[in-house]
From Swiss-Prot:
This is Dihydroorotate dehydrogenase B (NAD(+)), catalytic subunit. The keyword Flavoprotein applies. Disulfide bonds: none annotated. Its cofactor is FMN. It is found in: Cytoplasm. SUPFAM superfamilies: FMN-linked oxidoreductases. Pathway: Pyrimidine metabolism; UMP biosynthesis via de novo pathway; orotate from (S)-dihydroorotate (NAD(+) route): step 1/1. It catalyses: (S)-dihydroorotate + NAD(+) = orotate + NADH + H(+). The gene is pyrD.
Amino acid sequence: MTSDLRVSLPGLELKNPIMPASGCFGFGQEYGRYYDLNLLGAFIIKAATKEPRLGNATPRVAETPSGMLNAIGLQNPGIEAIMAEKLPWLAERYPDLPIIANVAGNTEADYVAVCERISQAPNVHAIELNISCPNVAHGGLEFGTSPEAAATLTKACVAVSQVPVYVKLSPNVTDIRPIAKAVEAAGAAGFSLINTLVGMRIDPKTRQPILANQTGGLSGLAIKPVAIRLVHQVRSISNLPIIGMGGVATAGDALELMAAGANAIAVGTANFSEPFACPNIIKALPDELAKYDLHDFKTFAVNQEVL
């Protein structure tokens, strides 16, 4: 029997559940040299902010066991350049590829302006509201660690967006569930999780942090158990769709996160060590499903009641 990998989410009709995570795939121009991006279920583009950002000082990447730390600082060319150059480039070459726009900012007004503008792009099918970036001085975690602030921002962005808004939740909180409940009540169409965990590395020679920003976001295989736990927790209190991410490098990793409650999967750090990570996972999914006598994702979900 042929496997059916299709997944239907608000604003997104996916041929398969696999997509590159924001910040790990740029705007697709580099990876598009290596394979046809039409193979992907969707594509979460690099964060868009109101003004161009150069990002943090270097060094801003450090290796860790089974992962990496990054403190890029949301470097991007700004919303107007993205609207004028990046999104048209994708639309011309991949007209049927659903694009999810990651949106960030310093203030509520910044987020609202970018959401309103980028949701007008014909190939943007959904927004990923980035309220959980740990590597910027303002915005990000200021919104993502408070249920009230997260709800206020979500409501404002949903009000102006022409496409569904998925809220990217932070793992750097004591309890993720009140924040998930708050943004659901504020109108979120779904969640994406997890963002990176705050970490640090020290150079024993200098006794100083390796990253110029001192701290960075930990990603890669090391965070997979945390991602599984938090996806499972959010699924326990909500029926909204979840785009799960954190430590996914194989089809088995993807299914484990889907068993925890994710409906689709974003692949991040794995793209750096294996540029073909996403198509490799997509190709392996039918055989991985067949191990459990399954041929689609309709019955592949965590067995728990939503409270």
